[in-house]
Amino acid sequence: MRSARSTALNRGEQRAVRYYSHMKLNMAEEEDYMSDSFINVQEDIRPGLPMLRQIREARRKEEKQQEANLKNRQKSLKEEEQERRDIGLKNALGCENKGFALLQKMGYKSGQALGKSGGGIVEPIPLNIKTGKSGIGHEASLKRKAEEKLESYRKKIHMKNQAEEKAAEQFRMRLKNKQDEMKLEGDLRRSQRACQQLDVQKNIQVPREAWYWLRLEEETEEDEEEKEQDEDEYKSEDLSVLEKLQILTSYLREEHLYCIWCGTAYEDKEDLSSNCPGPTSADHD
């Protein structure tokens, strides 16, 4: 009886132990942010800072080592030949050179120009060693084409500038001609107005020519037919504004002793010729 009871008790204890162990395992799998283990992990951040400094220091040493290796790198045969050639070209020939000694015997002096007149070159012709894979004359051809292209571009720019200057000059001439034409028309209207006033003062009721007087902008219906006839006569006149101004100016000076640019009616011809600069607008500038 006792053995059976103890056996059952042992089995119950074993089940309890297994259940308790299982519960502890489940609790361990869940994160406890208030546990010491989690706090210790957070506090382990500080030891990482020295590690970063060590990494940076290692990288700095590696870079210095690479620079030192680059400086101490053995030069290639091509680089050594280039250096020796440059040094040799920079140094002048000495008396130990047979060719130079022969030139000295012939009267040549160091630093003297070649040629009988002494107008030749002083420095030797530089060596241009070809290093590319292109054919002979290819680089010169490319250079010539580039120069031709540049020259063509310059010519186009020059022609464009000339065309722009010509267009600007033509515009200025047209503007000047327009201004001159407007000035002539203004002088002609002033002459017509003065001619009409002076003719009326002398009881001249009809102008010598229809265009000697200004035309009225508003006329009565009774004068419509006469206006049309006058317009036909006016249009038949084949005279420019300048020609009309010259004719009317001459009429005013001879008939009324008047100059529109002076704005004065003179006493006689002698007074007119003595005090008036001339019969044109340019004479009064």
Swiss-Prot record:
* InterPro entries linked to this entry: DUF4187 (IPR025239), G_patch_dom (IPR000467), GPATCH11 (IPR039249)
Where Phosphoserine occurs along the chain?
S141
Keyword presence, Metal-binding: no
Keyword hit for Acetylation: yes
Q: Which UniProt keywords apply?
A: Acetylation, Centromere, Chromosome, Coiled coil, Kinetochore, Phosphoprotein
Q: Name one Pfam family in it.
A: DUF4187
Residues bearing N6-acetyllysine? K149
Q: Where is this region: Disordered?
A: 59-84, 218-237
- Provide the primary localization: nucleus
GO CC term, one of those recorded? kinetochore
Subcellular location as annotated: Chromosome, Centromere, Kinetochore
A GO molecular function held by the record: nucleic acid binding
Instruction: Look up the coiled coil feature and give its residue ranges.
Output: 51-87
Domain G-patch span(s) in chain numbering? 95-141
**Residue ranges under compositional bias (Acidic residues)?**
218-235
Q: Which family does it belong to?
A: Belongs to the GPATCH11 family.
Name recorded for this polypeptide = G patch domain-containing protein 11
| Species annotation | Homo sapiens
